[in-house]
């Protein structure tokens, strides 16, 4: 389980996180996927918090724990977390298959096995036959699914989502939110954890209510419980 202990982050004179202590909540009924939403205005520090949890950015003080173990000395690639970026961050020089296979290759999986796993993961979210396509030829919704599959194909312990719908138009956001958790269940087979845990950063309360079992708001460096 994820836990934050007295986590503080300063950017110059700005205090983004003020000795935040927090534990992953108990979710009564999750249907295999637990979603905790983190709300807050732009610039509040939500994305910074995700990057600290992922190990991509250092806190000023405090620590991140998983299963009661401090992650202070655990490198990014060994944390077992996956981060899906706001703008999807697909590699334009790689086709869809090799984008999805990238994380597996970083883990030492052979090229052939990684590509086979990538193709199977693409099938799970309705993108069969897309492997050889250029990512630049995909629609926004297709790019989002490729980014999701790339995050999940490594079977992470925790999925970190940074505004996953903000790059899409309003009509498409509504359509894809409804199917998003189903895509997560299909692409994330639960080999590493019996329950799939998702930390969702969003500025959209309607999105948080549709997807989140629990939610907090990041305000003035503190996490305030909402539901």
Language-model segments: residues:
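Short helical segment in ABC ATPase nucleotide-binding domains corresponding to the A-loop/adjacent helical element
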Residues: 97-105, 115, 119
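Conserved ABC ATPase "signature" region
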Residues: 112-130, 181-188
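A short, proline-enriched helix->beta-strand linker immediately N-terminal to the Walker B motif
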Residues: 153-157
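Conserved ABC ATPase signature
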Residues: 134-138, 142
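Catalytic Walker B motif of ABC-type/P-loop ATPase nucleotide-binding domains
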Residues: 159-163
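Helix-to-loop junction immediately C-terminal to a conserved catalytic motif
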Residues: 54
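ABC ATPase NBD coupling module
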Residues: 70-85, 106, 111, 115
């Amino acid at each position: 389980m994820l836990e934050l202990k007295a986590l503080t982050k300063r950017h110059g004179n700005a205090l983004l996180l003020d000795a935040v202590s927090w534990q992953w909540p108990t979710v009564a009924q999750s249907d295999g996927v637990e979603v905790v939403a983190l709300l807050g205005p732009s610039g509040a520090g939500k994305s910074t918090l995700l990057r600290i949890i992922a190990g991509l950015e250092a806190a000023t003080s405090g620590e991140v724990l998983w299963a009661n173990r401090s992650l202070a000395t655990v490198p990014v690639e060994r944390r077992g977390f996956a981060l899906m970026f706001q703008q999807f961050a697909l590699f334009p020089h790689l086709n869809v298959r090799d984008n999805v296979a990238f994380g597996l290759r970083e883990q030492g999986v052979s090229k052939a096995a990684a590509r086979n796993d990538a193709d199977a993961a693409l099938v799970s979210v309705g993108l069969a036959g897309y492997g050889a396509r250029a990512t630049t030829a995909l629609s926004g919704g297709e790019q989002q699914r490729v980014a999701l599959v790339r995050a999940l194909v490594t079977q992470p312990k925790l999925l970190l989502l940074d505004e996953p719908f903000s790059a899409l138009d309003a009509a498409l956001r509504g359509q894809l939110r409804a199917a998003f958790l189903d895509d997560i269940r299909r692409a994330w087979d639960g080999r590493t954890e019996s329950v799939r845990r998702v930390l969702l950063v969003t500025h959209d309360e309607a999105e948080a209510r549709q997807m989140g079992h629990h939610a907090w708001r990041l305000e003035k460096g503190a996490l305030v419980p909402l539901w």
